[in-house]
Design a protein with these regions (language model features):
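Domain-level signature for soluble enzymes in the chorismate/prephenate branch of the shikimate pathway
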Residues: 1-176
Length: 176
C-alpha cells in the first residue's frame, strides 16, 4: 500500500494543497454499507477505514483541521476526530469566526463547524458565498456516532476543495 501512496503523492506533486478526497471516501463507505452484514457495527468498520484513509493521506501531504471547541464543548472535536483520524493535527478555536478564519487565511485546510441553525445570530455559512470562498465538503458524522462526548449535533467540514458529484449528494443553497 505504501508504494501506491508514494506513487499518488509523486503524481500529485508538491503543489497539491489538500490531499483529501471526500467524494471518493463517501462512495467507498456507501458501497461498504450496502454490502455490510452481521453483528459487527458498521460505525466501527467506518472508523477503521477513516483511520487508514487519514493515515495514508497524511503520507501524501500534510494537512490540518481547525475545530470549534472549548473546555465545555467537545462534540465537534469528537466528530472531527472520528472523521479525520487520530494522526491528523487538529486545533481547537473558541468561536465560529476564529475557526472559519483558519481556512480563509490558509492556516488550516479544513474547518469543522456546527450545522447551520436558523436561530444563529451570525451565520457562518453566509461567508461561503464567494467564488474563492471555502465550501462545505462533508457532513459529520458520516457513518454513525463514535465516541462523542456531550450533546450530539451535526457538523459540516469546510475547505477550499472542488468536489465531484457522487450521485448521493445534498446541496446547500444560500438565499439572502
Amino acid at each position: 500500500r505504501w508504494d501506491v501512496v508514494q506513487y499518488v503523492a509523486a503524481a500529485k506533486g508538491k503543489g497539491a494543497k489538500l490531499p483529501v478526497r471526500p467524494t471518493r471516501e463517501a462512495s467507498m463507505l456507501r458501497r461498504l454499507a450496502e454490502r455490510h452484514r452481521g453483528p459487527f457495527p458498521f460505525a466501527a468498520l467506518a472508523r477503521m477505514w477513516h483511520e487508514m484513509i487519514a493515515a495514508f493521506t497524511m503520507l501524501q501531504a500534510h494537512y490540518s483541521v481547525a475545530v470549534l471547541a472549548n473546555s465545555e464543548e467537545h462534540t465537534l472535536w469528537d466528530l472531527a476526530r472520528d472523521q479525520f483520524g487520530s494522526q491528523v493535527p487538529m486545533t481547537a478555536y473558541p468561536t465560529v469566526r476564529d475557526t472559519l478564519a483558519q481556512v480563509f487565511e490558509d492556516r488550516h485546510q479544513i474547518a469543522v463547524l456546527p450545522a447551520p441553525r436558523e436561530s444563529d445570530d451570525d451565520p457562518w455559512w453566509v461567508k461561503l458565498s464567494g467564488a474563492n470562498a471555502p465550501k462545505v465538503i462533508m457532513r459529520l458524522p458520516f457513518a454513525g456516532v463514535g465516541s462523542v462526548r456531550g450533546q450530539m449535533q451535526d457538523a459540516f467540514a469546510v475547505a477550499r476543495l472542488k468536489l465531484k458529484p457522487t450521485g448521493s449528494d445534498r446541496t446547500l443553497v444560500l438565499i439572502e
